[in-house]
Each structure stands twice: as C-alpha cells, then as structure tokens.
Amino acid sequence: MKRKSIAPSKSPADPISPDPVSGVRDGDLPAYVSNGLVGLRIREVPLLAGVAIVNGFAGVHPERRIEAAAYVPYPLALDIGVGEAWLSHQPWAVDDLEQAYDFSTGELTSRFSLELMGNRLLVEVITLASRSHPALVLQETTIRSAKTAAIKLRAHVDPAGVRGRGARHRTATPGEDEPVCDGSLLWISEGNLSTCGIACVSRCESAEEGKSGGDWDWRGPLNTHYCVDAAANSEVRIQQIAALVPSVIHERPDEEAVRRVAEGARLGFQELRKLNQAEWKDLWRSRIVIEGARAEHQRLVDAAFFYLNSSVHTASPAATSIFGLASWPNYHYYYGHVMWDIEAFCVPPLIFFQPDAARSLLDFRRRGMEAAKSYARLFGRDGIQFPWEAAPLSGQEATPGAGSGAAHADHVSLHVARAFSLYAEVSGDQRFAAEVAWPVLAGVADWFCSRVTWTDRGAELRAATGPAEVPNPPDNDSFSQMAAHEVLGRAVRLGQFLGHRVPATWNAARSSLYLPRRSDGVIPSHDDFRANEEKGATPSPLAGIFPYDFPLSPESERPLWSSFWPDGRSISARRCCRRFIPCGQPWPATGTCPSSCSRKGTPNTTLPGSTSVSNTAWTIRTPPFQPGRSSPTSPACFQDCFSV
C-alpha cells in the first residue's frame, strides 16, 4: 500500500492517526477494528468478508487440535449489484482503493470505485466497533452512481471459510407480528466447545421496494436484499448493525443478540456513532504526551495506546491475548491464548486508562482459580499455578505440542499475582484486596515456596525459563527470582494489613532467594549464562528493575545496564522509582493531587497530581488515576520518576 503523509496533530487532546493508505495491501495485514468484545480484520474492500473474532468464543484449532479462539461468520458483509453484475462475482472491477483510520474516534473509512455494467460507482464505507454498546459493530456504506441505475444491495452475515456450523437461523421473531431485526444466527464452533449468537439489522431509506430477507433455508446465509432506483450522481446509503454474543456470557446467545441489536436499531447508527465518539474522547483524556521527542515517537505511543484500549473492555469475558482480537490466516496469533504479557505489561497502565477493563482482565484469572489449583497439584505443588497459555474458554493450559513453555516458564504466576496486588493498591478497594487479591497472592506465594529448592546457597529456582524461552531451562533465572522477591513482599504486606497470620516460609524464601552474580557484581540472566547462547541478548534482568522493583544500589545497577548496552548512556541514578501517593497528599514536583481524581478533568495539561516523567531528552505527562463508571472508591495516584 502507498501511504499519504499527513501532518501530526496540533492539539494535545488529538492523537496522531496513521497516514492514509492507497492501493492493494500486498503483504500488509488488514485493518484491525475492535472494542475488546468483538474484533474485525477488515479488507481494503471492507464489504468483502474479513475475519471476525468474539472474545470468549472458542473452538478446536483446525491444525493443532487444542482449544483456541475461533472465527465467527463475518457480520458486516455487503454485496453491490447492477443488473446481473455483482461485486462478489467480479471483485477485480474495484479500483482507487483508499483507507484511513481515525484513532480519535476508532472509525475506519474506506473508499473505492466499482465498475459494473458500464456504470462507475464511488463507494465510501465507515466501520466501527461500539464501545458504548460492546456487542455491536456498525457499518455505513454510501454509494454514488455516475448514471441512472437500479442498484441492488445484499447485506449478509458471511460464513464462508469459517469452520463450525449454523444451528439455528431465524428471520422472524417468535410471537411478534413483525420481526424486530433482519434475522439471527446461532453458530457452533468446531469441536462444539462454544456457541455465538449473531443478529443483524439494516436500513436503506432510499430503497423503494423495501427490504426482503431470505428464509428459504434455515441453514442458509442470513441476508437482506434492497433495490434502489438511483438517479445519476445521487447517493444511496445503507446502514448495518450487528450484535455478537458468546455463550460464555449468555446460554442462548442468539436470542440475547436479537435483544442487543434491537436496542441498537432503536438508537440508530448516528446516535451509536456519537456515543462511540464520546467514549473515545473520554479515553483520550488519558493520552500520554511526550514533550520534546520526535513526532514518530509520539505516533508510536498513540498507536500503542489506541490498540491496547481497543482490545480490552469491561464486557470482555476472556481477558485478551497478546494480539488482542486481531487474527488473520497468516499466523497462529498464539491461538488467542492469555499469556503472562497481559498481566505484566497491559494491566498496570490499564488500571489508569480503563480501570474497569483492567478489573475484567483480572476477573478472567479469578474465574480460573480452580483450574490453577488443579494445575499446581498436577505438578505436585501447593497453592495455585497459572497456565503458560490459558485457553480463552476454560482458562486451562492449552500450549500446543510438547509444551516446554508450560513445563518450565513458571514466572507467569508471579505476574498474575502482582497485577492483582497493583489493582488493589491503586484502587484502594479494600473489599477487592481481601476477597479477590489476597487469595491470589497467598496461593501464588504458597506455590512459589513449594516450587523452590532449598540449598546451602538459599532458595533456588531450578529448571525454569524466563522471558527468553530456550530448549534447556536454566537454573535460577534472575528475572523470575527478582519478580518473586517483589510478589512475596506484596503477599506479606497484604496479609499483615488484612490481619492474617502470614506463613513464615514466605519471608524465609524472600530473604533467602538465590540470585546469581558474576565476579564483577553484575547479575546475569541465570546460572552459567553466556552472552553468545541462544537468546542471550534478552535483557531480562533489567525487567527486574523496571517494571519490577528489585532493590539494587546505583553501584550495582550501573554495571547491569552497561552489560547489555556497553555503548549506551551511563545510568547515573536508579532509572525507575515508583511510589503510590494517596490523593490529597503533596507531590514532589507538581503540587497537590486533587481529592477526587476524575477522567472528566482537564486533559493533557500539567494537572495538579498528574504524573511527570522526565529525563534529559523528553517529558511524559499523563493524568492521574481516573475511575470509570463502576470503579472502586478511594483511588490513589501512581507516580513514575525517571532519572537518566
């Protein structure tokens, strides 16, 4: 695709959207539109079916035969016809392809021309996934005809290429004289692991003949037909709304999808679009602004913020995968499994951007507690051990094949426990801390103490890989040990705060953790580490410093940084310092945090109580903790200070 450069945003409230692209994708991936419950991969001709994923909908993977996220029929397909010529029959009649993604609203706009029966049609398509009504995805298509013509439209749910089967297909609404929507479909995944309900409604005001649906075959496609007598240079507009509900949320999901799409039809496309724009405007109040850096750095930060927030929602029943809900046949995308990256790197910022969504991610792990207990017992260990690759539906281990990562990458449980602790501390929700976070922290602490081997050197972690997955698991992965130091400390502090009797083994293990060191004092990645070994360049010990908080003196920290970046800038002080400061208490550099932090405050300015992260090159500013509609009370603010 060719890119058309655009100027960066001038308002601090406006993100930098990607440059518009033109032409065919070639090897590029299609656009990704998602709200955290429904994810779409949208082709450069968006009316042709792409890929649709629904959070929590799972099936048997066609190749690996494991539980995995599964495709559902594409809900926003549309065919355009003139006479006997249709877009779907001759897609090569398309030209002038353009796409633009507006990060400020989450809307994808696609344009193309289409030559049918000697008539040139100009087509514009707006596609979005509703954040205010997360079961809904929407599309508006505007067609301008160069000549007077009878334009045929066929809105349909396209199951082509999707493994699984339709179990129920309705175009009428039982007990109603008039159907409340165009129709509904109950889709069963391969392996019968779960079902998904899809309901759709469409509207084309200029269609003189009204609309007609195909109920000739209850197993057939769900489609609605229109015919419009369009004058030359006039516009024909069709709006489509589809609801998608997984069975993990509702046992009869097609019926619930009908109710959801009926509410969407009542509100209408434009109102839903306005509500979605308002949701994104609200989210962008938490935009991270880098002052003094080049525009491409801010562009990357905006893209990361957008895609992270696109991939999570309060309504997400199965957390999210490391690729969100973006899937395409070119790659396995880790089968939609939930892995340690989510708790280590996604939950902490989401506690501030979308606290309700962060809670939803943690709820997935909470629902998997029994599976984690059984998994620990399977290894002969105490407590709870979370799986390396958690299946989206069952929450159980689903690593394909021999599963070497599942057998030896034990650090995943530490990240999960830390994420629960962070949410409890930042939110100030004591009920969450006592009823939700404490069982997780206590279970992981018990597990870790049963996992280590006690030697004359201390508590050693034998045969455990860190972030660098290698065939032969080493002993005493330093990142895992540093993470355990923090998690055990958090478990002890929370237990004492709640008045529990903390097992002595937790403190004993924490104070006795064996951490390998070279003769020059540098902490290597693990025992017998060699820089030229497979994946030896992975700087995993640095992650023990940030985002983890392993205590090292500046004298010990400098050579550790230099061992990975010998030609880089020296670190003159501890790179990362993290503190929780309750609302209303003074901040070192920015004054006083307001007693009630809210997303409704003035965005993207040096707010009292905002985070100010500085080094010699640039400053990052973010607003303070911003509770959502159902966030816990008594929030606390979080500060990161960088010194380089």
Language model regions located:
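Active-site core of glycosidic bond-cleaving carbohydrate-active enzymes
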Residues: 335-368, 418, 435, 481-485, ...
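Helix-terminus loop motifs that line ligand-binding clefts
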Residues: 312-330, 356-418, 424, 431-435, ...
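Inter-helical turn/loop segments and adjacent helix faces that build the functional surface
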Residues: 151, 248-255, 287-291, 352, ...
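Active-site-proximal structural scaffolding
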Residues: 31, 71, 134, 219, ...
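Acidic/polar, glycine-enriched structural segments that form the non-catalytic walls/loops
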Residues: 2-33, 37-334
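Contiguous, well-ordered alpha-helical segments that form the cores/surfaces of helical PPI scaffolds
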Residues: 142, 302-309, 332-336, 340-351, ...
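Acidic/histidine-rich catalytic neighborhood
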Residues: 447-501
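Amphipathic, well-ordered alpha-helical segments in soluble domains
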Residues: 74, 106, 412-419, 444, ...
